[in-house]
Amino acid sequence: LETAFQDVTNVYHCAALVSFHKADFHRCLQVNREGTANIVNFCLKHKVEKLCYVSSTAALSYNSNGLTDESFKWIPGPEVSGYSISKFAAEKEVWRGIEEGLNAVIINPCVILGPGNWKESSLSIFKSASKGIGFYPSGSNAIVDVRDVVLSMHYLMNAEISSKKFLCTGP
């Protein structure tokens, strides 16, 4: 990473391990929290102008009374996935960086869909549906087009906005 950060002005941190398997909990935590801590530290060291961290709505607490927004405080519970815990822990690393002087924004997209690999992404639901495999997921999830996420990230990086987080969901 040392070489990658030479002469970099803006960083879009989108990398994460996405898994909802209990066996992947420690790996998710390591990749997502420690990876983000490394990115934050390099941004601070190399005086990056701005960081956009892509988190997830999974890092927000569930609101049993209606819609969730950015102000919800994290309340872990037995139904919270390891992925959710890892993304929340990664967000805490970004907030640490902000406290240390990093100019950063956090975007929390819901389930992202768009052109891509139907085998290893959220698009796998379409692969199942195309084979006639019916399903109905429990709970509720919003979806957003990947192009809308990218436009939102671009806007946030070019706006005079810092030290805030934003939900990014579809219509």
Range-by-range predicted roles:
Residues 1-34:
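NAD(P)H-binding glycine-rich loop region in Rossmannoid oxidoreductase-like domains
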